[in-house]
Amino acid sequence: MKLAKVGQDIETGNAAWTFDGKVADTFVSHVSQSVPLYEKGHDLVCQLSDYFVDKTSTVYEIGTSTGELIKKVAQHNAHREGARFIGIDPVGPMVEKAKEHCADTPSVTIIEDDARNFEFEKSDLIISYYTIQFIPPRDRQQLFDKLYEALNWGGALIMFEKVRAPDARFQDMAVSMYNEF
């Protein structure tokens, strides 16, 4: 299979995207350049967390990759002493980077696991930031059910995701804006 270069020495082919190997070393730079408003989305998640996180909260991020977002959310909520922030990712090199990145933020724990298999505690906030697209479609509903069951009453799932527009015209607009980015 011929692999295509997608930036920062990252290669992929049809149905062959992986986060293993050296991807963790350049992930933050790559995703910031390839996903429009990626960091702005982090800021929005932090602002939304104000409505759900208190000093007794458990907060999860599934697909935490290098831990950038879970660390930002934890630092944003540092005044809520006692809150716990848990990043989950199934890819060893990403987990290693996340643990290094979050080492100076004691309220953050990084766990290597697949969200589909993880035993969630009750939580007030679960974050899925461009993660569900990497879950096989046949497993998505079961994962959504699991995340819903893990939420306390009044809790939230904040999800950013690439989606197909319901109308071809809007899909064309979104693709055009993405390509211009």
Task: Give the role of each language-model region.
Residues 117-121:
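Short conserved loop adjoining the S-adenosyl-L-methionine
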Residues 130-134:
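Short catalytic micro-motifs in class I SAM-dependent methyltransferases
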Residues 141-153:
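A short glycine-rich, Lys/Arg-flanked "PGG" loop and its adjoining helix->strand segment in the class I
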Residues 60, 66-116:
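Class I SAM-dependent methyltransferase SAM/SAH-binding core
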Residues 1-26:
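N-terminal, positively charged/glycine-rich alpha-helical extensions of SAM-dependent methyltransferases
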Residues 37-55:
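Conserved alpha-helix/loop element of class I SAM-dependent methyltransferases that forms part
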Residues 158-181:
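Conserved class I S-adenosyl-L-methionine
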Residues 127:
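A conserved beta-strand element that flanks and buttresses the S-adenosyl-L-methionine
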